[in-house]
Structures are given as structure tokens and as C-alpha cells.
Amino acid sequence: MSWHVQNENFILDSTRIFMKAFHLLLFDGSLIFPECILIFGLILLLMIDSTSDQKERPWLYFISSTSLVMSITALLFRWREEPMISFSGNFQTNNFNEIFQFLILLCSTLCIPLSVEYIECTEMAITEFLLFVLTATLGGMFLCGANDFITIFVAPECFSLCSYLLSGYTKKDVRSNEATMKYLLMGGASSSILVHGFSWLYGLSGGEIELQEIVNGLINTQMYNSPGISIALIFITVGIGFKLSPAPSHQWTPDVYEGSPTPVVAFLSVTSKVAASASATRIFDIPFYFSSNEWHLLLEILAILSMILGNLIAITQTSMKRMLAYSSIGQIGYVIIGIIVGDSNDGYASMITYMLFYISMNLGAFACIVLFGLRTGTDNIRDYAGLYTKDPFLALSLALCLLSLGGLPPLAGFFGKLYLFWCGWQAGLYFLVFIGLLTSVVSIYYYLKIIKLLMTGRNQAITPHVRNYRRSPSNNSIELSMIVCVIASTIPGISMNPIIAIAQDTLF
């Protein structure tokens, strides 16, 4: 008799759980419709790969790109809707989160055509590559909208695991294996440190895990000014620092950039920073609301170290990928200025605007590197000497992207930095802005040094790689991504106002 009662109770409990899950999916699922499109695309990829032969490979690219474009479309249709919290407080949708999700989707959409020819030439497995890219994109999107500590931990782990696998995708390359091992070990350590910081906030707030509820809990327990908050702040800053890769948390960046496949580096160099910036902004601004002076000081130190070390060490590099790795460390220092300024002086708007331009500039430069590497098999900066004589289009495209990264007018990078530095100046961050201007001049030096090499290499200085350079027909997908990124790195500088207006509309 007791067995029947237990069995009935088990069935009733299971039914309640199922109905609750169904209710969440039915009423809250519409709030993650862009993410659901990506999940459907992932399932479709697996089904086609398991039921078709190699001749169906173009369909894999088409499905991946289509799911990303459809997800962007769904996101744009949802723009300006009222902020909503769903899935029992795990996820929040608002304009601020959605614009970062849009940036991540944009990165992935541009990276897939950039990878097609590279994958075919290196004979890598295409299905797994696309699965990892889409899953990492999904993790980044969930991280942008994460509203509690569990989601903030699980979402970046989803992104990070795919990143580790992508960085070691060329298994026979010793450098790739080394890069993956360093990336994995440091990623695991940083995740542990991040969770330890979360545990401090969880205890101090009286057992709360939602971001806004943590603030209320700290007020109720009167612990918002306790030393434990400072300890939690340090641990969380170190954990997030690995994702953003500012100095001194940058040690993994150059090795991973150099050892990983170039399309993977292009993908990781932008998506990881976009997702981490969105998460860092919400974590610092909400749970650490009462410790703004402390986290401002911490981020100011990180920004100064990043801008100085990143740009100075980039001067000495001989590899294009390592140079862009150190350049990205300097670039994240500029982005941190926007995080420090906050919403009061358009800091977030300037950060988002600059991030949009950074995506086009960085992906454009990496598209040029992928194309040059496929045609010559080298990554050395000196081997680019005299490229203009063989391929003026590629040389000019790379030059424009590098000049935009350096912040020369009238390119998009100049206006992005100008807006960012102006907001920092208005907020009273005079020293940070001065360091930013000074290091921007340093970055222009090493970018111009490469451009001079591209344009003015004499016959005796031209390397065998460029001398034997053969330009392939201009119908490959890499050039498509490159053209889009080059245009986006130049034209938006002329029409900044609409972009700034959209960025200013991204409030919490």
C-alpha cells in the first residue's frame, strides 16, 4: 500500500515539474526567441551532418549563416520593448543586453564566411567547427542577459569550453596544442576565482543570487560596506579580467592568438570581449553599487596597465597575430574607460560605439591576415614587404583597418576614440584620457611602420613570399567579410550621430 502511495506522489511531483517547465517555455520562451533560433540551427546542423555526405557541406555554411541572420532579425524586431525578467529571475531582456547580443551575433556572422576557405584549405572538420562557433555564440548571448550568479557562471563556461576546443582545432600543430593547454589551465583557474568571489557576495547578502536582490540583501544585512565586499570585488575582478584580458591578466592572449587557427583568433578576439564587457558592466554597476569608488580605482589601474603595456610591447612583435594580440590588450584599456564613466556621462554609449567600430576594424585586419596566410603560408610582419606591388586591394584594405585601429581621421576608429575620450574627460578622468591619447600615438607608430612596409617595399626588400604571391579569383568569402569590415571601418565615421543615438538608448 505504501509503495502505491509513494508511486502516486512521485507521479504527481513529476507532473508538477513538467508543467512548470512547460509553463516557463511557453510564456518565457518568447523572450529568448533569438537564442532558440540558434539552438534550432545547431540541431539542424547535427541532423544534416549525420544523414548526408561531403557534397552537402555548402548547406552547413548556409544553415549556420541563416540561423545567425534570423537571430539578428528577431533581436531587431524586439528592440525598444519593455525590460523583462524571465525564467524565475535567471535572465533579463532589455535594450542594453540586446545591443551586446547584436554585436556578438554580428561577429559570428562575419567570422563564418571568413573561415570557409581556410577550413577547406586546411581540411579541418567543418561541422564541429560550426557547432563550436554557434554554441559559443549562444553562450555569449546568454551571458549578456544573465541576471543571477548561476547563469553568469554557466554561460561563460559554455563559451569558454567551445573556445578551448576551437583554439586547439588544428590538433597536429604543436603551437595550437600549447596554446590550448595554457588557455584551458588559466581559464579553469579564473573560473574558480570568479566563483569564490560570488560565494562571498552570496554569504554577505544573506543567500541571494539575483543581481538586484543581492543589493537589497546587502542593505538588509548592513554588509554593503564590510571588508568582505572588497574581498569579493578583488576576486570577481580577477575572474572577469581573464575574459577581458587586460594587463596583468593578459599572459594567455599572445600565445593563444599565435597558436590558434587565424579565423578562430578573429572570432575570439571580439566575441569574448563583447560578452565579458556586458557582464562586467552589470556586475560592477549593480551588486557593487555601494563600492563604486573601489571598483573605479581597480579598473583605472587595469586600464592604465593595459594601454601602456599592450601598446609598448606591440612595437617589438614580429608576428602579425601577436602584434594584434598586444594591440587588443591596449584596446580593452580604452573600453574600460567607458565602463568606469558609466551611464551618467554617456560612458556606456561611448563604450558600445567604440566596440562596434572595433569589431569591424579588428575582423577586417584578421580577414587580411587570413587571406595573406593562405596565399603565402607566413605570418611574419617582414614578409608583408612590398605587398602593394602584388595585391593593391589587400594591401589597401589592411592599411585602412590598421589606420582605423590607430585612430587616424576621418576613419571610424578616430571618431570612436574621440567620443570615448570626450566622455572620459567630461567625467573627470583626465589622467586616463591623457594616457589613452599618449598610447594611441604609440599605436599609430607601429601601425604606420607596417603600412610603410606594405607600400614601399623595394625590389631587393621584397621577400620570396610576396615575390611568388599569386592572387586567387576574387569570389571567395574571405574577401566578402573583408570588404564589409573595411567599409564599416571607414564610412561610419562620417555619420556618427545615428550610431550614438542608438547607443544612448541602451539603458538598464
From Swiss-Prot:
Superkingdom of the source species: Eukaryota
Keywords: Chloroplast, Membrane, NAD, NADP, Plastid, Plastoquinone, Quinone, Thylakoid, Translocase, Transmembrane, Transmembrane helix, Transport
Entry's transmembrane regions: 24-44, 59-79, 99-119, 124-144, 149-169, 184-204, 227-247, 295-315, 323-343, 354-374, 395-415, 418-438, 482-502
Compartments reported by the entry: Plastid, Chloroplast thylakoid membrane
Catalyzed reactions per annotation: a plastoquinone + NADH + (n+1) H(+)(in) = a plastoquinol + NAD(+) + n H(+)(out); a plastoquinone + NADPH + (n+1) H(+)(in) = a plastoquinol + NADP(+) + n H(+)(out)
GO biological process, one term: ATP synthesis coupled electron transport
A cellular component term, taken from the record's GO annotations: chloroplast thylakoid membrane
Keyword Transcription: no
Record-level Gene Ontology MF annotations: NADH dehydrogenase (ubiquinone) activity; quinone binding
Quaternary structure and partners: NDH is composed of at least 16 different subunits, 5 of which are encoded in the nucleus.
HAMAP family from the UniProt entry: NDH1_NuoN_1
The protein's role, per its UniProt record: NDH shuttles electrons from NAD(P)H:plastoquinone, via FMN and iron-sulfur (Fe-S) centers, to quinones in the photosynthetic chain and possibly in a chloroplast respiratory chain. The immediate electron acceptor for the enzyme in this species is believed to be plastoquinone. Couples the redox reaction to proton translocation, and thus conserves the redox energy in a proton gradient.
NCBIfam families: NDH_I_N (TIGR01770), PRK02504.1 (NF002701)
Family under the similarity heading: Belongs to the complex I subunit 2 family.
Name of the protein in its database record: NAD(P)H-quinone oxidoreductase subunit 2 A, chloroplastic
Gene expressing this chain: ndhB1
